[in-house]
């Protein structure tokens, strides 16, 4: 499938060198136009999203299936038909979907719109501009994108809840208990911990080195220091093995669904009033580091956030607990 779609970008034969620019341009556009009829929107989306990271791939594919379900798009149409659509109108329609037709939150609508824009950008490049790029509205009263909340929706545990959660998790699965502690101390995403290799650990210095890849290009190395008690437990768990740190009984990488299940179960057993997901641990780490008085720049060195604004979004401590509560200026 991939090679077929890449055939959209065939080079022009040398026999056209003697022709004028306008003639060659017309021939090239016609050639692209004819080939576009051979590809369905569905196969293009499947090819394109396969090149994205797992989370984005799943999100984008879900978006297009949802758009087809409510009748805004047909995945069976070919690229010629898709290129003739008014993409800006479709963006506007996504934002104006009534709740009677689809119970989408504003955040969901913006994800659907972003998916659509990304697709048109990809196809604009693949078709040498025949498919136009959908343009988001920037008018004050009808913006396609705007901030829906100041902080992330994810809950964070307090110290007592964290201790209770870890206690229950250890009873359920000691390996997942180690995974949770690795995530908490470093404010790490589940993917960063589940893919961790043993050679990234330095037991002598009690550190673990994490690599974050931004936009699949810029690599950022983050070193997290762990308590000796934890490192001892981790060393005992690993034993003489090599390769991945956390593995299943068959030696494979632990899946996200596995820890999502045990984390949720431990949260229930600890009587925590909200569902514990892997992402809750990241929000908990930021909130706890802030409570302990760490600066945003120090927290960024731990979590890998690129701006203080992102740290603020994850900080779930009370907004009343600020400088005005600690000192009086009048």
Swiss-Prot record:
Q: Which InterPro entries match?
A: CB, DNA_brk_join_enz, Integrase-like_cat_sf, Integrase_catalytic, Tyrosine_recombinase_XerCD
Query: Which PANTHER family would you find in this protein's record?
Result: INTEGRASE_RECOMBINASE PROTEIN MJ0367-RELATED, PHAGE INTEGRASE-RELATED
Domain Core-binding (CB), residue spans: 39-124
* Biological process, per Gene Ontology: DNA integration; DNA recombination; establishment of integrated proviral latency; symbiont entry into host cell; viral genome integration into host DNA
| PROSITE patterns membership | CB, TYR_RECOMBINASE
**Protein family (similarity comment):** Belongs to the 'phage' integrase family.
Residue positions of the active site? 189, 214, 279, 282, 305, 314
Q: Which ranges carry the Tyr recombinase domain?
A: 152-327
Q: What is this protein called?
A: Virulence plasmid integrase pGP8-D
Going by the UniProt record, its keywords in alphabetical order are:
DNA integration, DNA recombination, DNA-binding, Plasmid, Viral genome integration, Virus entry into host cell
List the GO molecular function terms: DNA binding
């Amino acid at each position: 499938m991939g090679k077929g779609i890449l055939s959209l970008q065939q080079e022009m034969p040398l026999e056209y060198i003697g022709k004028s620019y306008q003639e060659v341009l017309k021939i090239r556009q016609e050639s692209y136009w004819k080939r576009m009829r051979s590809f369905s929107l569905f196969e293009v989306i499947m090819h394109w999203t396969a090149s994205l990271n797992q989370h984005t791939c799943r999100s984008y594919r879900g978006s297009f299936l949802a758009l087809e379900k409510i009748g805004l798009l047909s995945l069976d149409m070919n690229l010629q038909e898709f290129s003739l659509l008014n993409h800006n109108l479709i963006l506007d329609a996504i934002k104006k979907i009534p709740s009677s037709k689809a119970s989408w939150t504003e955040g969901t609508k913006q994800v659907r719109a972003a998916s659509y824009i990304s697709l048109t950008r990809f196809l604009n490049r693949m078709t040498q501009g025949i498919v136009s790029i959908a343009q988001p509205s920037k008018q004050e009263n009808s913006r396609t994108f705007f901030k829906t909340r100041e902080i992330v929706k994810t809950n964070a545990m307090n110290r007592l809840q964290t201790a209770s959660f870890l206690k229950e998790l250890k009873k359920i699965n000691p390996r997942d208990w180690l995974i949770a502690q690795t995530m908490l101390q470093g404010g790490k995403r589940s993917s960063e911990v589940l893919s961790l290799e043993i050679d990234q650990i330095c037991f002598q210095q009690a550190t673990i080195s994490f690599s974050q890849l931004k936009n699949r290009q810029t690599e950022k190395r983050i070193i997290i220091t762990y308590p000796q008690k934890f490192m001892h437990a981790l060393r005992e768990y690993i034993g003489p093995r090599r390769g991945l740190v956390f593995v299943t009984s068959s030696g494979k990488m632990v899946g996200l669904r596995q820890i999502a299940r045990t984390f949720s179960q431990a949260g229930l057993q600890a009587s925590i009033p909200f569902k514990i997901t892997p992402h809750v641990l990241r929000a908990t780490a930021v909130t706890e580091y802030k409570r302990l008085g760490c600066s945003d720049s120090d927290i960024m060195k731990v979590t890998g956030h690129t701006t203080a604004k992102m740290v603020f979004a994850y900080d779930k401590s009370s907004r009343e607990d600020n400088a005005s509560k600690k000192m009086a200026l009048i």
